[in-house]
Swiss-Prot record:
The record marks 362 as: Required for activity. It comes from Desulfitobacterium hafniense (strain Y51). InterPro entries: ATP_synth_asu-like_sf (IPR023366), ATP_synth_asu_C (IPR000793), ATP_synth_asu_C_sf (IPR038376), ATP_synth_F1_a_nt-bd_dom (IPR033732), ATP_synth_F1_asu (IPR005294), ATPase_a/bsu_AS (IPR020003), ATPase_F1/V1/A1_a/bsu_N (IPR004100), ATPase_F1/V1/A1_a/bsu_N_sf (IPR036121). F-type ATPases have 2 components, CF(1) - the catalytic core - and CF(0) - the membrane proton channel. CF(1) has five subunits: alpha(3), beta(3), gamma(1), delta(1), epsilon(1). CF(0) has three main subunits: a(1), b(2) and c(9-12). The alpha and beta chains form an alternating ring which encloses part of the gamma chain. CF(1) is attached to CF(0) by a central stalk formed by the gamma and epsilon chains, while a peripheral stalk is formed by the delta and b chains. GO terms for molecular function: ADP binding; ATP binding; proton-transporting ATP synthase activity, rotational mechanism. Belongs to the ATPase alpha/beta chains family. It is a peripheral membrane protein. NCBIfam families: atpA, PRK13343.1. Pfam families: ATP-synt_ab, ATP-synt_ab_C, ATP-synt_ab_N. It is found in: Cell membrane. This is ATP synthase subunit alpha.
Length: 502
C-alpha cells in the first residue's frame, strides 16, 4: 500500500484540528476524619450547603457544616468503606431521587434505590429531595374529603385532601394500624399512597408491605424504608425523599397520601448527626433548627390551586410519645405545625376500644369542610352527645341515683362508644358509616344491650348491602340526607331491629 507524503501531512493536520485541549477541572478535597456516618473533608472551599459530594466506590455524601478550614458532611451509604486520605469530588448538584409512575408498587431505600428484589427502576425523572413549599397564592383551601374508612376519624376528626393531620400516641397503641387502614381505604379512589418507614425494624416494614400487598394496596403505593439498622443520615433524608416522590404526582394534578412513620425517630437521627457535627445542643439535646426540620417537610403538603393543576398531597405524620407526654419538645413542635391531631391512648387500647382514638382531645382544624353533607348531618350530633357522655360518665361514678335524662344520655353514650369500635383492615365506605352512625345518634340502639351492639351492626350492614343497596347508592350520589332518605333509613333500622330482638 503506497501512501503519498501529502496524504500523510493532511491526516496529521486533521488530527491536530480535532485535538481537544480542554481540561476538565474538578474541585477535589481530602477526607481528614471519618466515622459514625460523618466525614470531615479538607480542600472543598467552594462547596455549598446541602451539596452532593462523591466519595470513592460510588458512595455519596451531603455537605452539612461549612467551616473555615473543612466541611462536615453526612455519608449516604456505607461509611465503613471510606478511609482517611480518600479523595472527595464536588458534583454541583443537591441530592436527588428517582420519581414517577415507575416507582409505584416498589419498595425503595432513602435514595430511591430498589430493595425489593424486583430489578431496577426504569425512570429518567429525578427530583431534589429539598424543595420549596408552595406559596399562599398557589394553594387552595382544603375542601375535598380523604376518607380513612374509620368511623371515629371520618365522623369526628375528618381529614381533607391537602391537610396535615398528626397521629400521636405511645408505642403499641395502633398508630401504624390507623395509617395502613387509611392506605387500604384509598383503593379505587385514584390516590397514590407513600409509606415512609423511619427507624422501624426491617421485619415490621416487611409486615406492612405484606399487608398492603394482601389487600391489593401495593398497586397504588410506594414504600420508602430507612430501617433501624441503617446509618443516621439515611433516616434523616428518608422523609424528604418520600415527599419528593409525592410532589412529582401532586404537581401533575394527582392526589397523594404520604405517611411518615415516624418523625420522632427522624428527629433522633438528626440530633445524632448534629451532635457528631459539633453543632450546639438545645432543649432535650436537639439542635436549634429541629422545628425547621419538620416544618419544611410538612409545609410541602398542600392542596394546589387550579392554576397548578388542583393536585394535592395529604400528610399523616406519626409521633411516638413517652407515657402520654404530649408536652415534650418534638410532640409540641409537630402539633403546632399540623392542622390537627389524632390522639391514641394506651388505656383505651387496653380496654379493647380500638382504634384507641380519644375523640375528646383529637381535633381537625379543617373540620366539616372535609366531610360530605350527609356525614356532617350525623356527626354534629354525635360529637355533642359524646362530649356530654364523657362529662356525665365522670360524675356518674360518684352517685347511683341519677335522673332519667342523665341515665338516657349515659345509655346512648355507651352505645355510641361501642359503635365506634372497628376491626383492623376493615375500612368502611362513607355511606355505610352514615347509616350506622344515624342509628346511634337517633337513639335506635338505646334498647339493645351493649354486648349485642356489634352483632346488630353486622346484621344491619348485611341487610343494607343486600336488600337496601339502592339506598346506600342514593347516599353515595346525593351526599346529603333529606326527609325521604331519613324515613328509608329509619324503616330499614326498625325492620332489622325487629328481627334481631325477636
Amino acid at each position: 500500500m503506497n501512501l503519498r507524503p501529502e496524504e500523510i501531512s493532511s491526516i496529521i493536520k486533521q488530527q491536530i484540528e480535532r485535538y481537544d485541549s480542554a481540561v476538565e477541572v474538578v474541585d477535589v478535597g481530602t477526607v481528614i476524619q471519618v466515622g459514625d456516618g460523618i466525614a470531615r473533608v479538607h480542600g472543598l472551599e467552594k462547596a455549598m450547603s446541602g451539596e452532593l459530594l462523591e466519595f470513592p466506590g460510588g458512595i455519596y455524601g451531603m455537605a452539612m457544616n461549612l467551616e473555615e478550614d473543612n466541611i462536615g458532611c453526612i455519608i449516604l451509604g456505607k461509611f465503613t468503606e471510606i478511609r482517611e486520605g480518600d479523595q472527595v469530588k464536588r458534583t454541583g448538584r443537591i441530592v436527588e431521587v428517582p420519581v414517577g409512575e415507575a416507582m409505584i408498587g416498589r419498595v425503595v431505600n432513602a435514595l430511591g434505590q430498589p430493595i425489593d428484589g424486583k430489578g431496577e427502576i426504569k425512570t429518567d425523572k429525578f427530583r431534589p429531595i429539598e424543595n420549596t413549599a408552595p406559596g399562599v397564592v398557589y394553594r387552595k383551601s382544603v375542601h375535598e374529603p380523604l376518607q380513612t374508612g374509620l368511623k371515629s376519624i371520618d365522623a369526628i376528626v375528618p381529614i381533607g385532601r391537602g391537610q396535615r393531620e398528626l397521629i400521636i400516641g405511645d408505642r403499641q397503641t395502633g398508630k401504624t394500624a390507623v395509617a395502613v387502614d387509611t392506605i387500604i381505604n384509598q383503593k379505587g379512589k385514584d390516590v397514590i399512597c407513600i409509606y415512609v418507614a423511619v427507624g422501624q425494624k426491617a421485619s415490621t416494614v416487611a409486615g406492612v408491605v405484606k399487608t398492603l400487598a394482601d389487600h391489593g394496596a401495593m398497586d397504588y403505593s410506594i414504600v420508602v424504608s430507612a430501617t433501624a439498622s441503617e446509618p443516621a443520615p439515611m433516616l434523616y433524608i428518608a422523609p424528604y425523599s418520600g415527599c419528593a416522590m409525592g410532589e412529582e404526582f401532586m404537581y401533575n394534578g394527582k392526589h397523594v397520601l404520604i405517611i411518615y412513620d415516624d418523625l420522632t425517630k427522624q428527629a433522633a437521627a438528626y440530633r445524632e448527626l448534629s451532635l457528631l457535627l459539633k453543632r450546639p445542643p438545645g432543649r432535650e439535646a436537639y439542635p436549634g433548627d429541629v422545628f425547621y426540620l419538620h416544618s419544611r417537610l410538612l409545609e410541602r403538603a398542600a392542596k394546589l390551586s387550579p392554576d397548578l393543576g388542583s393536585g394535592s398531597m395529604t400528610a399523616l405524620p406519626i409521633i411516638e410519645t413517652q407515657a402520654g407526654d404530649v408536652s415534650a419538645y418534638i410532640p409540641t413542635n409537630v402539633i403546632s405545625i399540623t392542622d390537627g391531631q389524632i390522639f391514641l391512648e394506651t388505656d383505651l387500647f387496653n380496654a379493647g376500644f380500638r382504634p384507641a382514638i380519644n375523640v375528646g382531645i383529637s381535633v381537625s382544624r379543617v373540620g366539616g369542610s372535609a366531610q360530605i353533607k350527609a356525614m356532617k348531618q350525623v356527626a354534629g350530633q354525635l360529637r355533642l352527645d359524646l362530649a356530654q357522655y364523657r362529662e356525665l360518665a365522670a360524675f356518674a361514678q360518684f352517685g347511683s341515683d341519677l335522673d332519667k335524662i342523665t341515665q338516657m344520655r349515659l345509655t346512648r353514650g355507651e352505645r355510641m362508644m361501642e359503635i365506634l369500635k372497628q376491626k383492623q383492615y376493615e375500612p368502611m365506605v362513607v355511606e355505610e358509616q352514615v347509616v350506622v352512625l344515624y342509628a346511634a345518634v337517633k337513639g335506635f340502639l338505646d334498647d339493645i344491650p351493649v354486648d349485642k351492639i356489634k352483632s346488630f351492626e353486622e346484621d344491619y350492614l348485611r341487610t343494607m348491602r343486600t336488600t337496601k343497596a339502592d339506598l346506600l347508592a342514593k347516599i353515595r350520589t346525593e351526599k346529603a340526607l333529606n326527609d325521604e332518605l331519613n324515613a328509608e333509613i329509619e324503616k330499614a333500622i326498625t325492620e332489622v331491629k325487629e328481627g334481631f330482638l325477636g
